From Swiss-Prot:
May be involved in transcriptional regulation. It is found in: Nucleus. This is Gastrula zinc finger protein XlCGF16.1. GO terms for molecular function: DNA-binding transcription factor activity, RNA polymerase II-specific; RNA polymerase II cis-regulatory region sequence-specific DNA binding; zinc ion binding.
Length: 112
């Protein structure tokens, strides 16, 4: 397939979408045009601001179809869903043990 790849000239990361590439470039320029009206924290993209504002509002629009638990971010729901499926896709290359989240794998790495 003829997939266009966008290359960052600063750090050489590669992106398949132009929007992801443009958002990434702001990490190098320091541009943070989106500001939280409550705490004035700044963000590179609008979607990050929206997710952050849910901390202040308490809104949790993403609910688990298995148990009904609600989350403020879709990524948190996706991580939670693994507790129901048993999926463990993060592998420790040192010992072969698998984990459901990158953070659990990172914590495990400290034991080696």
């Amino acid at each position: 397939p003829n997939t266009v790849i966008y290359n960052c000239s600063e750090c050489h990361k590669r992106f398949r979408s132009k929007s992801g590439f443009v958002k990434h470039q702001k990490t190098h320029t320091g541009e943070t045009p989106f500001v939280c009206f409550v705490c004035e924290q700044r963000f590179v993209c609008h979607s990050a601001l929206i997710g952050h504002q849910r901390i202040h509002t308490g809104e949790k629009p993403f609910s688990c179809t298995e148990c009904g638990k609600c989350f403020s971010r879709r990524s948190h729901l996706n991580s939670h869903h693994k507790t129901h499926t048993g999926e463990k896709s993060f592998l420790c290359f040192a010992c072969g043990k698998c984990f459901a989240s990158r953070s659990h794998l990172t914590a495990h790495h400290r034991t080696h």
